[in-house]
């Protein structure tokens, strides 16, 4: 059986900052972009205070005055180093590894019996926490899309093990019923609105949709996602991708952007995401130039 585990570091940048400041564990933390302009990472405690991703720093100063929020300038050298350590541990505990981003990786666990998948994942989680100091959530499923679903649920289980397995049909259907359609891996904001206009609100609604309708309206990519929700394997694990000549992060605006302030927030958010994608490509290479602090 092909088993995929998605390991995702919890609030990665904020967690990296607490490694050397353990007294800040469970405290609200935000990390700012290089010029300290916008928020690019938040601990779960900061999220609960209503601090949004990409918001300009000056807009949250009142929250910082009211609550003991700890603020850090981004330190990409540190984050890259910690990420490499996490990926190194993962590589030693799986059959195949795909580094998906600086804080996420897909693992293939083929060689282990089905009964050991959850216990194996819990063991990996404990090792990363003990050796490196980073908390992770792990989702286990038959393919990458469902492992993303499982990981989404695992992150919400803050008081539990944060390891969720959805292997059989019953587990899949229960999980999809509590997941919004926009939370499915590969479903962007535009497609989400289109699906909602067609009375498809949850992942389970899409799961139960006629496959011919999916192919007609969502194309090949949408059909691939649909098939993965049904347990098929359509998106392979890529251990070593071809060298990329460019990196792009783009979104279509729903309406005209007339405010420079709004445009600035979008640009910073997308530039930060593009930087993360580039850094993840360089984790196991000899980057040139070596200074990627921009």
PLM feature spans:
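Long, highly charged, low-complexity intrinsically disordered interaction regions
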Residues: 120, 124, 128-178
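Residues that scaffold, gate, or flank divalent-cation-dependent active/transport sites
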Residues: 1-102, 106, 124, 229
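Catalytic palm subdomain of template-directed nucleic-acid polymerases
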Residues: 107-125
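Short Gly/Ser/Thr- and Asp/Glu-enriched loop/turn motifs at secondary-structure junctions
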Residues: 100-104, 141-144, 283-286
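Conserved small/polar residues in nucleotide/adenosyl-binding loops
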Residues: 284-294
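Short acidic, glycine/serine/threonine-rich loops at helix termini
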Residues: 16-18, 41-44, 146-154, 219, ...
